[in-house]
């Protein structure tokens, strides 16, 4: 259910996300390739199967092996990724390989049981000034730490995500 209010938009889920018809990336006004990884991550626990077809970049699925380590059911064949929704994801230590894939790992971590640690935050910080803070405003439990004592732009910082209390 979607309702507009003076202070924002309220979304209420009536249950599990459902798989969507094939997601095909395309130049504007088509589905943006930059959104593909995050949407894929959001659908990891959906009911059904979603097919992603990457028509812009040849090598856009660097995040998939990390998602699979968390229990995602994803099969890759060239530019096609087939995502079968699973009941649950398991927390893991994962590595962001790029900006969009890193954001996808954070989203997956919020769905997983346990504490997920996402390494190599410098990729994520290139495009999101404060992703942990922004998601915390939505109720996410995210902690960022610098494990090597370097500057804030050091690639060593990590983000730990905890699923919300209501996650199943």
Regions found by a protein language model. Give the residues of each.
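Short, structured segments at the rim of ligand-binding sites
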Residues: 1-168
């Amino acid at each position: 259910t979607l309702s507009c209010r003076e202070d924002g938009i309220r979304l209420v889920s009536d249950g599990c996300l459902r798989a969507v018809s094939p997601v095909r990336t395309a130049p504007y006004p088509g589905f943006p390739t930059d959104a593909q990884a995050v949407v894929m991550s959001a659908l990891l626990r959906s009911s059904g199967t979603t097919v992603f077809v990457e028509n812009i970049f040849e090598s856009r699925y660097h995040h998939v092996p990390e998602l699979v380590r968390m229990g995602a059911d994803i099969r890759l064949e060239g530019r096609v990724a087939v995502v079968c929704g699973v009941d649950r994801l398991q927390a893991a230590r994962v590595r962001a390989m790029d900006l969009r894939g890193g954001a996808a790992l954070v989203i997956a971590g919020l769905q997983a049981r346990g504490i997920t640690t996402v390494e190599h935050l410098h990729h994520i910080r290139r495009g999101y000034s404060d992703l942990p803070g922004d998601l915390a405003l939505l109720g996410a439990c995210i902690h960022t730490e610098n494990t090597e004592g370097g500057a804030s732009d050091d690639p060593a910082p990590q983000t730990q995500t905890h699923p919300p209390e209501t996650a199943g």
